[in-house]
Amino acid sequence: MASFALTEPDAGSDAASLRTTAIKAVDSEGEHYIVNGSKRYITNAPQAGVFTLMARTNPADKGAGGVSAFIVDAKSPGISLGKPDKKMGQRGAHTCDVVFDNVRVPAANLIGGVEGRGFKTAMKVLEKGRIHIAAVCVGVARRMLDDALKYAMERQQFGQKI
């Protein structure tokens, strides 16, 4: 199972405000990135085999252009998970924090092979997800309205229908 790691404690889902960094390095084992930072409310993180991670590869670029997307093996050394979040709804989608502490990610795992395209990648995913959540909310609201109307049509108070 894959998990989408965008949201951060101080940035929410604002990809342009991400603080998680992925700094390129080269050593005897080749090119890689060193990832440091925290992600919050990451859906399916406890079950994930891989993360699609959004991280800042260009710390000088504070905007969306400095964000890149990576595929990261969830079993990589340096990845730790927070306690499972307790939620009122969507309990089937388990969420928790994910912490990246000097996690080594092969350069080949940069999605698209070019730095700075992570914001566009994130938006492609989020646009569909946001439409889905909106549709779920409309469906739930309609059901509640139908149930309330049915109850109001049957309910009596002081011998009269309300």
Tell where the protein language model's regions lie, with residue ranges:
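Non-catalytic surface loops within mature trypsin-like serine protease
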Residues: 8, 26, 57-59, 73-76, ...
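A generic structural signal for well-ordered coil/turn residues at beta-strand boundaries
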Residues: 14-18, 29, 47-49, 66, ...
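A structural signal for short hydrophobic beta-strand segments in well-ordered beta-sheet cores
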Residues: 20-24
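Glycine-rich phosphate/pyrophosphate-binding beta-alpha loops
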Residues: 11-13, 40-46, 89-90, 128-133
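Intrinsically disordered, low-complexity coil segments
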Residues: 25-32, 112-117
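A short core secondary-structure module
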Residues: 31-32, 36-81
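Glycine-rich beta->alpha junctions and the first turn(s) of the following alpha-helix
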Residues: 69, 80-162
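A short, Trp-centered hydrophobic/proline-enriched beta-strand micro-motif
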Residues: 1-7, 54
